[in-house]
């Protein structure tokens, strides 16, 4: 299992510095008003929301889509992530907790979890079959859900 440590850049910030196995230093910077972000790992990747009304995002590098994510049901915390290399899902581990499971073929292969209930610090633990940038993309989708919950 690879472990990535996600540390907010400030006390009330949703932006992150990410470090850990196979990831020397990465950063995740969120758009203030939209569900979009930029991943630096060390190359730059954009996370773009494809539609205002549907839960669809793309991971883009140099105008090339590397992966896409879809939230098929707005009432669940589940996203399907598709790329040329791997296909997997993230799903809320428990309706009362912020943690997400990373699933491949309906089998858990990792988790995205806050350090404790009152922090934005988090860890990503995942099988190395999923590339680091896709692990961070999955984390980005989890943070979008956390931000929506914090606003509501």
Predicted feature residues:
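Intrinsically disordered, low-complexity proline/glycine-rich segments
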Residues: 1-152
């Amino acid at each position: 299992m690879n472990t990535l440590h996600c540390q907010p850049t400030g006390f009330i910030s949703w932006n992150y510095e990410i470090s850990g196995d196979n990831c020397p230093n990465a950063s995740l910077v969120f758009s203030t008003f939209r569900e979009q972000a930029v991943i630096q790992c060390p190359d730059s990747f954009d996370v773009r929301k494809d539609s205002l009304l549907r839960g669809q995002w793309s991971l883009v590098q140099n105008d090339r889509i590397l992966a896409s994510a879809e939230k098929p049901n707005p009432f669940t915390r589940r996203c399907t992530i598709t790329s040329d290399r791997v296909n997997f899902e993230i799903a809320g581990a428990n309706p009362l907790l912020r943690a997400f499971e990373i699933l491949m073929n309906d089998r858990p292969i990792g988790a995205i979890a806050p350090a404790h209930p009152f922090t934005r610090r988090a860890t990503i633990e995942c099988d190395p079959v999923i590339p680091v940038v896709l692990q961070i993309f999955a984390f980005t989708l989890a943070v979008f859900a956390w931000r929506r919950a914090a606003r509501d």
